Structures are given as C-alpha cells and as structure tokens.
Swiss-Prot record:
Gene Ontology molecular function, alphabetical: RNA binding; uracil phosphoribosyltransferase activity
Sequence motif: PRPP-binding, positions: 98-110
Protein name: Bifunctional protein PyrR
Functional note: Regulates transcriptional attenuation of the pyrimidine nucleotide (pyr) operon by binding in a uridine-dependent manner to specific sites on pyr mRNA. This disrupts an antiterminator hairpin in the RNA and favors formation of a downstream transcription terminator, leading to a reduced expression of downstream genes.
Any one biological process term the GO annotation gives: DNA-templated transcription termination
Gene3D superfamilies for this protein: 3.40.50.2020
Binding site for substrate: 40-41, 85, 102-110, 135, 159
Family the UniProt entry places it in: Belongs to the purine/pyrimidine phosphoribosyltransferase family. PyrR subfamily.
Chemical reaction(s) catalysed: UMP + diphosphate = 5-phospho-alpha-D-ribose 1-diphosphate + uracil
Gene name per UniProt: pyrR
C-alpha cells in the first residue's frame, strides 16, 4: 500500500506555530493555561506547542500527559479499575483552562475518554481541544477548537502522524 504525504516537516512546524498563536489568542495570554497531550503523539505535540508558546510569550506553560487506557470504551473493562490519576502534570488543573491535544481527531472516542480522565479528578474552568489533523467520521458530537488541517478521508483509509521524537521523521500520511 502506498502512502500519500499530506504534511511534511515544514508544514507540521508551521501548523504547530499557528495552533500556539490560536491558543494564546483564545486564552488571551498564558494565565491559567494548561496543556495536556494524549499519549503518545498528542503528548509530543503538546510539548512542541508549549515550546512555541514559550518562544512567543517567554512563559513556560505547564504541560502534561493523559493516559486514556482505563477510560476507553473499545477495550474490555477490567474488574479492578486502577484508582490513580490518569494524567501527569505537576500543577492542579482545577479552575484552569485546559487544552487537550491529540494528533488525529477521528470518531471522537479518544477525546471522550480524555475528558473522562480529566473530569474524574479535577474540574477545570474550561476545556479546549487541539488536533493536528481532523479526518472527520465522528461517532460522537465532538469538535476541535484548534485544527491544524482538515483532511477528508474514506473510512477505510488510515491517517498516520509520524513525529521525530518516536518515529524518526515528521510527516502526516494517508495510507
């Protein structure tokens, strides 16, 4: 199966920069702003957005990760749920503006699971959603506030995001 490159390294960098600016505009700066990336690639994108915001405003926004494993509805639930916080960040996110970051928005189920993970232990003032790619085909009424690129796809196509931190290249491809 051949791959079609939709975004190369330069396009991803420009998109991360634009999303960082949009988040700052949305929040009117960095006050009370928290970035939470969904493991795995969303966490790396969150770090990149954090770095861009720091370049723009010279403030390091608190950034963490969300592990949605225990909140997914497509896996058989275990009887003994783990009773520990499913996100990792060094600050309290209650009454903060939390931006959840993912690589690809598809059915909306990953985002729903991330909302469950956050809301189980905290009550943010506001939650926003940023995604590098929105490919459509939603199964839940979820919409991103910050979208890098809308890529209409067929359901049988796969959209893959490759990030240098784990994939040794930066690209968004349709396979």
């Amino acid at each position: 199966m051949s791959e079609r490159i939709i975004m190369d390294e330069a396009a991803i960098q420009r998109t991360v920069t634009r999303i960082a600016h949009e988040i700052l505009e949305y929040n009117k700066g960095t006050d009370n702003l928290i970035l939470l990336g969904i493991k795995t690639r969303g966490a790396f994108l969150a770090r990149r957005i954090q770095q861009k915001i720091e370049q723009i405003d010279e403030i390091a926004v608190p950034t963490g990760t969300i592990d949605i494993t225990q909140f997914r509805d497509d896996l058989e639930q275990t009887i003994n749920q783990v009773d520990e916080r499913s996100y990792e960040i060094d600050v309290n996110i209650t009454n903060q503006v939390v931006i959840i970051i993912d690589d690809v928005l598809y059915t909306g189920r990953t985002v729903r699971a991330s909302l469950d993970a956050v809301l189980q232990y905290a009550r943010p003032k506001k939650i926003g959603l940023a995604t590098l790619v929105d490919r459509g085909h939603r199964e839940l009424p979820i919409r991103a506030d910050f979208v890098g690129k809308n890529i209409p796809t067929a359901k049988e196509e796969d959209v893959s995001v490759y990030l240098e931190e784990i994939d040794e290249r930066n690209a968004v491809v349709i396979e």
